[in-house]
Amino acid sequence: MSEHVLPAEGPMRFISPIIQDNPTGWGPYEMPDQFRDMPYQPFSKGDRLGKISDWTMVQDKKYQNKYASQFGAGSSYAYFHDEDESTFHLVDTTRVQKPYQSYQRGRARGQRGRGARGARTPGGMTTLNKPRERKLGKRWGQRGAPMKIRDASVTVRPTWVTIEDMDFPRLAKLSLPGIKEGEDIVSCGTLEYYDKAYDRVNVKHEKPLQRIDRIFHTVTTTDDPVIRRLSKTAGTVYATDAILATIMCCTRSNYSWDIVIEKIGDKLFLHKRDNTEFDLLTVNETSVEPPADDGNSINSPRNLALEATFINHNFSQQVLKSGPTEPKYKFQEPNPFVSEQEDGEVASVGYRYRKWILNNGVVLIARCEHDAVMQGPQGETQFLTIKALNEWDSKLANGVEWRQKLDTQRGAVLANELRNNSCKLAKWTVQALLAGSDQIKFGYVSRAQVRDNSRHVILGTQQFKPHEFAAQINLSMDNAWGILRCIIDICMKQKDGKYLIMKDPNKPLIRLYDIPDNTFESDASEESGDEQADTPFAPLYSYGNSKRV
């Protein structure tokens, strides 16, 4: 083998680099040619790339050094404000007083959709949501605004004995399915035909509401001659459609009301007290902000109820074809409440006395009402229930402007009425179902001027089938029958006597009282001797009595 011998290398030489001496500082003082005219920005490898928004200049108030950079990154894009005297001008700093209500609504919108625990405002303050606010308020002993105390419909006397309290959550779970359609026993009265020209009324072609001088009879159960006659041969429970609707829809009510129940043997008579506000229509009863209870205002609950009743009576008669030559629909018997002494014209109304079997020997007989009739598509006769919704002041009622929305967004208007008048609409629907009406027709009536509650205009009409409308407003007739049957069973277990069921004015429950037999009899005799001006309708409208419109 031969060995390879590497050639010998020469001695290594050190080549000294070119050193640039900078007598005034450190580092090179000349820019190499390959780096000349090249832009440069100080940076840190921990910084994110991007220049659309430089967040490195943001300082967290809790952690001051959270975004801090020791390399001066982003300083070339930082904004430094220089005062410009040329654009300086005075600004009017006068505070404008804003309505309290609008301010609250704005705050609610601003906080909606934020986190469950709270949200941070631009000023750095954390806002709590409502449940957390209430929880902290209770912890520290804080109290909110005082709850509005409503008056009871009747003063509870010391001699009354409370039998049972029935709260709304329990009543809402009751159900009595399988109740068949009512059977007609007696039919009375005369009905006029509906004028279909009012179906074409709209906001642009409104019609003024007229005052129709007709007599309305609001006779209670025990004063009805037909019910007195039927009680001898049929039925165990007797009432009117208005009384039944009030009981069946009690879970939707906020205002106080009362119904007198008399038990005689195995029979129950449900009736209302004389000269009360039972027949007045509530306005915005279920609204988040109900009308303020100011007796001097035209927008107080009582004055609004009088106005709504006035509108309903006149509207239900104005939309009919009235006149001596117009055809009329007559039932088998005449109106049982018309006497020979009455000199006025009686309103168009038909009475149906119907029977329902509620099982276990309970047979209900009730007087129901129709307002009009009309010809159906196939020429058949259809019975109508006619009611009117009234607009009083959309700003105070937290509603929508009917004149702006009614023609284009009628569904929104009706949805708002369902929120504000859920109890009233449910009672109207129950009355139409009990009477067997084929259609329920609503009229939209508004004030001609917001501050004038004596002049009104008709802005439109809308028609529904009662069963379809009941499903739309989530009204369960099985639950309604269950509530009625529950109250009937409790009363049937009591001894013979007089009882009163009353909605608590400030709690979601109804109470059943055992009252003396002579209760309200002395009140009726005293009220019968009062002047005519003390009737419920006298303060607003020049009615001769509580039955005339």
From Swiss-Prot:
Keywords: Cytoplasm, Initiation factor, Protein biosynthesis, RNA-binding. Residues 106-117 have a biased composition (Basic residues). GO terms for molecular function: mRNA cap binding; translation initiation factor activity. InterPro entries: eIF3d. The keyword Transferase does not apply. Disulfide bonds: none annotated. One of its GO terms (cellular component) is eukaryotic 48S preinitiation complex. Residues 523-533 have a biased composition (Acidic residues). Residues 101-130, 521-549 are annotated as: Disordered. GO terms for biological process: cap-dependent translational initiation; formation of cytoplasmic translation initiation complex. It is found in: Cytoplasm. Its main location: cytoplasm. Residues 277-291 are annotated as: RNA gate. Component of the eukaryotic translation initiation factor 3 (eIF-3) complex. mRNA cap-binding component of the eukaryotic translation initiation factor 3 (eIF-3) complex, which is involved in protein synthesis of a specialized repertoire of mRNAs and, together with other initiation factors, stimulates binding of mRNA and methionyl-tRNAi to the 40S ribosome. The eIF-3 complex specifically targets and initiates translation of a subset of mRNAs involved in cell proliferation. In the eIF-3 complex, eif3d specifically recognizes and binds the 7-methylguanosine cap of a subset of mRNAs. Belongs to the eIF-3 subunit D family. The RNA gate region regulates mRNA cap recognition to prevent promiscuous mRNA-binding before assembly of eif3d into the full eukaryotic translation initiation factor 3 (eIF-3) complex. PANTHER family: EUKARYOTIC TRANSLATION INITIATION FACTOR 3 SUBUNIT 7, EUKARYOTIC TRANSLATION INITIATION FACTOR 3 SUBUNIT D. This is Eukaryotic translation initiation factor 3 subunit D. The gene is eIF3-S7.
